[in-house]
């Protein structure tokens, strides 16, 4: 079986970079793109920030209030409301460029995509490096956007590799360098291993990739269950056979509200939720849409977020 060659393309600090493209004079300033709430003032959270702002500890999910405190010494800091229509327009132009180079194109989100280029470059990693640079150059020329690209024989390694040399990076993981590449990573760098999993492993004295590779699959399944345990066992060995699947951008219709006050009163929250559903129902009926996934995202007092999703066989609101 011939070697697959998969690219993962990730646009660098996407929302903030779009704002730099719109206003180049802001490039030397900390830029913070915010999701402002209906409460006014500094109520809300950071959607993303450029690398200058990140040096001061400003990251996604931080409250705007705390972000401003951390950037207090930077009087040139800029806090901007998210403009998703503008970001989507740049994303669409960039994705259309990427599609030209792919045998199979998989859209992941506004700022990332997978490409299977195996046939186009005849399974040649040297040509994969060249085509990756061509993609980067064309996106920069036509949209002024920079991106980071990971190249490997599977989606998992390419995803990790695209994050390896950010921003504006290009990392190729050759088949005979997989073990060395993974050994140099932190456990948290493995896609799919979150903070809680890392903490659980640390409790067992597993603090490095090498430690983690010493655990057999049965131990990992016992700790995390069959699905997660097996995934971790394979991931730290660079094993992943998931195909690149053609996928177009999905349409999302949602209504978001910030309550006038924090509350744990069930009746009050139910009333607010039903009002949102009524508003959303009107939009769906007006646009004659069908849907298959319903989600309710919730942000708590300290900005910890949680989302519950339900998949439906088929449904249309009437």
Model segments located where?
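Short acidic, glycine/serine/threonine-rich loops at helix termini
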Residues: 18-20, 44-47, 157-165, 244-246
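Long, highly charged, low-complexity intrinsically disordered interaction regions
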Residues: 127-184
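Catalytic palm subdomain of template-directed nucleic-acid polymerases
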Residues: 115-132
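Positively charged, low-complexity/disordered segments
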Residues: 306-318
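Short Gly/Ser/Thr- and Asp/Glu-enriched loop/turn motifs at secondary-structure junctions
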Residues: 108-112, 152-155, 289-293
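DNA-contacting surface of Y-family translesion DNA polymerases
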Residues: 189, 202-304, 310
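Residues that scaffold, gate, or flank divalent-cation-dependent active/transport sites
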Residues: 1-110, 114
């Amino acid at each position: 079986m011939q070697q697959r060659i998969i690219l993962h393309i990730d646009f660098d600090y996407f929302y903030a970079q779009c704002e730099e493209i719109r206003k180049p004079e802001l490039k030397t300033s900390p830029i913070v793109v915010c999701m402002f709430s209906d409460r006014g003032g500094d109520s809300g959270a950071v959607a993303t920030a450029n690398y200058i702002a990140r040096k001061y500890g400003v990251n996604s999910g931080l409250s705007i209030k705390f972000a401003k405190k951390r950037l207090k010494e930077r009087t040139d800091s800029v806090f901007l409301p998210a403009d998703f229509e503008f970001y989507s327009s740049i994303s669409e132009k960039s994705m259309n460029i990427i599609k030209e180079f792919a045998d199979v194109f998989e859209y992941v989100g506004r700022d990332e995509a997978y490409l299977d280029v195996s046939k186009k470059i005849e399974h040649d990693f040297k040509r994969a490096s060249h085509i990756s640079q061509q993609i980067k150059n064309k996106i920069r020329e036509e949209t002024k956007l920079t991106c980071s690209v990971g190249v490997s024989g599977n989606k998992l390694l390419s995803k990790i590799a695209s994050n390896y040399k950010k921003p504006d990076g290009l990392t190729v993981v050759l088949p005979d360098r997989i073990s060395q590449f993974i050994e140099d990573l932190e456990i948290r760098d493995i896609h799919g291993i979150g903070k809680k999993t890392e903490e659980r492993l640390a409790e067992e004295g597993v603090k490095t990739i090498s430690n983690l590779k010493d655990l057999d699959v049965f131990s990992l399944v016992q700790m995390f269950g069959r699905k997660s345990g097996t995934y971790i066992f394979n991931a730290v060995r660079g094993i992943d056979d998931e195909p690149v699947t053609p996928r177009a951008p999905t349409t999302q219709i949602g209504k978001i509200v910030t309550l006038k006050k924090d509350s744990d009163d069930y009746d009050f929250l139910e009333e607010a939720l039903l009002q949102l559903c009524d508003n959303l129902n009107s939009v769906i009926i007006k646009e004659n849409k069908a849907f298959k996934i319903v989600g309710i995202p919730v942000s708590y007092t300290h900005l910890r977020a949680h989302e519950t999703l339900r998949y439906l066989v088929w449904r249309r609101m009437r």
